[in-house]
Amino acid sequence: MENWQATEILPKIEAPLNIFNDIKTYTAEQLFDNLRIYFGDDPSRYNISFEALLGIYCNKIEWINFFTTPIAVAANVIRFNDVSRMTLGKVLFFIQLPRVATGNDVTASKETTIMVAKHSEKHPINISFDLSAACLEHLENTFKNTVIDQILNINALHTVLRSLKNSADSLERGLIHAFMQTLLRKSPPQFIVLTMNENKVHNKQALSRVQRSNMFQSLKNRLLTSLFFLNRNNNISYIYRILNDMMESVTESILNDTNNYTSKENVPLDGVLLGPIGSIQKLTSILSQYISTQVVSAPISYGHFIMGKENAVTAIAYRAIMADFTQFTVNAGTEQQDTNNKSEIFDKSRAYADLKLNTLKLGDKLVAFDHLHKVYKNTDVNDPLEQSLQLTFFFPLGIYIPSETGFSTMETRVKLNDTMENNLPTSVFFHNKDQVVQRIDFADILPSVCHPIVHDSTIVERLMKSEPLPTGHRFSQLCQLKITRENPARILQTLYNLYESRQEVPKNTNVLKNELNIEDFYKPDNPTLPTERHPFFDLTYIQKNRATEVLCTPRIMIGNIPLPLAPVSFHEARTNQILEHAKTNCQNYDFTLKIVTESLTSGSYPELAYVIETLVHGNKHAFMILKQVISQCISYWFNMKHILLFCNSFEMIMLISNHMGDELIPGAAFAHYRNLVSLIRLVKRTISISNLNEQLCGEPLVNFANALFDGRLFCPFVHTMPRNDTNAKITADDTPLTQNTVRVRNYEISDVQRMNLIDSSVVFTDNDRPSNETTILSKIFYFCVLPALSNNKACGAGVNVKELVLDLFYTEPFISPDDYFQENPITSDVLMSLIREGMGPGYTVANTSCIAKQLFKSLIYINENTKILEVEVSLDPAQRHGNSVHFQSLQHILYNGLCLISPITTLRRYYQPIPFHRFFSDPGICGTMNADIQVFLNTFPHCQRNDGGFPLPPPLALEFYNWQRTPFSVYSAFCPNSLLSIMTLAAMHSKLSPVAIAIQSKNKIHPGFAATLVRTDNFDVECLLYSSRAATSIILDDPTVTAEAKDIATTYNFTQHLSFVDMGLGFSSTTATANLKRIKSDMGSKIQNLFSAFPIHAFTNADINTWIRHHVGIEKPNPSESEALNIITFGGINKNPPSILLHGQQAICEVILTPVTTNINFFKSPHNPRGRESCMMGTDPHNEEAARKALYDHTQTDSDTFAATTNPWASLPGSLGDILYNTAHREQLCYNPKTYSPNAQFFTESDILKTNKMMYKVISEYCMKSNSCLNSDSEIQYSCSEGTDSFVSRPCQFLQNALPLHCSSNQALLESRSKTGNTQISETHYCNYAIGETIPFQLIIESSI
């Protein structure tokens, strides 16, 4: 049988020299002819394998195409027949170091040869195609049959060639793709390479904390300044410099063959710069003067491995062209089939072909410059240089900038109306990706702020209890508070025991907090900082049963937030906002306020006025009896001393304004009383910001907005039992008062039984109860007007009515018969002196006696001795949630007491000071009237304060259960005596409940806290890759083709075994994120809906739950148990998607509650939104105890500031932010796993430690590779460290920093800055701010539109 050799399946004509296209065309034509021979009619021709023929063809086409692409500049191609059997290769290179000759008796360096080891990386690629059985059958038929058979045969042959061409094309693309992936695996980002080149360390030198931190900071800065450098501007020098830095930052190849890829001027290409088509086109446009098309001499052959006897690689030499068809078939089936001589066609003198390439001139070097768009076009594989990027942004809402420190840095003059929206911003403005202005205000964040979890302290308290207690000095500062509850009837008996003991009372945490200024509060030496974990709850330590326990109580009102977190000026600015909203037309009350202030602070206040107050005690009939006396007292003191009497008593003011309009008193004095009442009503109308007609849970909605309207807050001075519509527990003795235990006063008859019990603990009340309107006005007076105008220089007092009446009035002639009573004068010196002091010295004895008798006539309406009542009541339904369900607020009120504004001396034995409330506990009055208190003040002079520093008796000092706490008394002690101060105290009574927050937010009133908004956006980006010439060797052999026959088809599998060897002396390739291709998310204002994230939580009260969900925009009710279980287990989205999306995928903004005093500079540079840095380069993250300490130990300063934190509500362990966004707590919260949280990466401890370990490893490994293999460990393999890809794609997570977003608190500032393109500089305009962006996205977006 004739043995067909390759003569009929090999080229018959030599291909034109150095022409790639001719090679490809010629090879394809010969394959077609050879296939006809192969499928001819002679069976003897089957001795040449069809699979081998396909493999040789694919090899030829595959490599010819590879050599024509610019990426081949970075390759060094080597043939090795046994590469498929090689799993791990190790190539040794002997490199002789260059030397410099020296003189002047300096010893020259010795000849040095370094052996560098490079490891191979196996990466096979494969492709397959199917040929149907029908097609193969037609191929096997002879060409000599009918015309139809020949046509079918030719069609079948074309089918084979199409499949073969597609497979060969796939191998071409696969080879380039595999090589590109290999380059990327050893191409660290440029910012890493530059940082390591600047901070080179010896490979055996351990990095210090300072070095590691410096490198980390340099990495961060270079990353942020190099991102999207093609989009930032069209500055040629800037872009040229970055590209030049890319080229200079990499090392040369070990194989420096200048014959490959050389221009006609014999200038070798130093490397190749590759990128996606968009970036390359942009570079071509910008750097056109440096770009040219040159004819380059490209290789069309590859090297060959030579194997020694020991089967080890000993050298690399360049050998013949790839095994062409001629040489293969000549030796096929012979003894010389494994010996391939040099090709006769491509000899040494003709081993290169001319190829046109785009080149870029960088300095004195020439690099290839192109894209691989044609490789990936219309394929299902993305260009590896087109990558995704995830960036997280943060920006503030509601940060307060004090007007006294306000200034403007705006170059262009921006005029803002003088409105409180501009003076206390409650909105933030920014642009989305389509340059549409977005606005977020407090009403928009209600789905996060009004969620039940936010108003539940259960987990906060539990986590704080699980922590170790303070030790040492901090224990003595924080853990000395004792809660003393005592029978109200015994409080008066033991009232002065504290002062008699002369022991200093330890300050509670609230007092300590409010003694600090804003800057000191955030410092690590603030011992109370660990207790500030929640904006709506006070946390502290108490002593109970000789053990230290954690106490958590609701703050109830905005005014109870510590002043360093909500300062005085903020409360006043917020009050102005309420005034503006209410459109309050403030009349001129200045003169009235001035005279009232002078009267309240005057040291010469008549004691007769206190006696009259005691006799009248708010009773209209008693007042009418004493009307003449009262009018004379008022007239004398107003005309002679310019003092307005009875301005310390609400009941007296109301009685005077209602019943003395008949010119009994001077008109000016009466006008002041009327102005006082008008002012109180004005305050009431101003703070009524909700719809008074709306009801919720059977109560007016305004009750939920401001505590002054809430019946649960009682007036501190009462003379008759108030309405108890809220079922408060009122106690005067051992048992709570009820309708049966409270007795009624019978003034019109001889009430002997009441007179006998006048000094007992039995409580008597009038038949007439004050109206709800009167009760609200009285609370406004005592909690707002009086403290603001007296600066807390008032004191509660009790009166021993029994002894007072007996000593002053049960003497002659008061107890004489009527005739004798009318005729005889009064002889009581005490009473006469009181009358002369109160009425003036001009009265005769007869006149003073007449006045005394008038006083005596009012005794028919006398009240009982003063009592202290304890009021224990739960909060409103909106605040009764979570742990607060069982919370009972405590108030102590004076029943039949009075408010002193000056000490009583003459009647001291009948009146006793009762410091029962911080508004009414003036140490001056107390010390003057009680010797024990005066001694106490002399012993501890620092306690002589009106701001809460004067200690109250322990049963009355229940700070954490009271409604008004230390911040109230601190403000009222130092506030100016003005209408604004009164309004501010009233506004501070705004509640911290979800209903109150919703009402205020929807009315554009600041709710008392700020917010940090965090959003993650996704981007498609384009990267540039630079690689030096011959940076990587590609080891290959012929493709292996196998056939798998099936019933209906035969599958042919092509496998190309490849192995890659890095040839760089160091990092020979690098990448850079150059161009923003697409913004995938909308960069908008969609707020995270916590009702979907935590779906099963609901408020305790069903009506409250329904109201909240409706007013914050949650349409669906709470899910059923089965729905909730499915959501928790499998995840779910509890809302329908919007019908129209104008701006793409919605990015979610999450809310972190933040103090309004957070430094605005915190938002002007990249920081961790939790308020404390989490990237711990100064700590070994493998030491988890030290790492956790760096994260959560606030006794240490933050790594970026001199403070411990900027937001304790998020940075402390177990704080509100930590609970919401730390995934470790989600099991306790029943979390919806389908909800994406951009904040989780900054709060989850396990993720933070993991990324820190990865960052630590990345820096350490790159430092080891910062030197080349010539001056470091020659075994180092220069490839990207693990985690580099994640670092580049999610830099914010690894850096633990969010980026500032271009935003402003006022739309005018945003438009002004956008108009000038000044978006990267942060500015301040008095109370408004504009935050500059780190990456100029606005400029990038504008240039791309």
UniProtKB/Swiss-Prot annotation:
Keywords: Capsid protein, Host nucleus, T=16 icosahedral capsid protein, Virion. Homomultimer. Makes the hexons and eleven out of twelve pentons. Interacts with triplex proteins 1/TRX1 and 2/TRX2; adjacent capsomers are linked together in groups of three by triplexes, heterotrimeric complexes composed of one molecule of TRX1 and two molecules of TRX2. Interacts with scaffold protein; this interaction allows efficient MCP transport to the host nucleus. Interacts with capsid vertex component 2/CVC2. Interacts with the small capsomere-interacting protein/SCP. This is Major capsid protein. Its main location: virion. The gene is MCP. It is found in: Virion; Host nucleus. Belongs to the herpesviridae major capsid protein family. InterPro entries: Herpes_MCP, Herpes_MCP_upper_sf. Self-assembles to form an icosahedral capsid with a T=16 symmetry, about 200 nm in diameter, and consisting of 150 hexons and 12 pentons (total of 162 capsomers). Hexons form the edges and faces of the capsid and are each composed of six MCP molecules. In contrast, one penton is found at each of the 12 vertices. Eleven of the pentons are MCP pentamers, while the last vertex is occupied by the portal complex. GO terms for cellular component: host cell nucleus; T=16 icosahedral viral capsid. Disulfide bonds: none annotated. It comes from the Viruses. GO terms for molecular function: structural molecule activity.
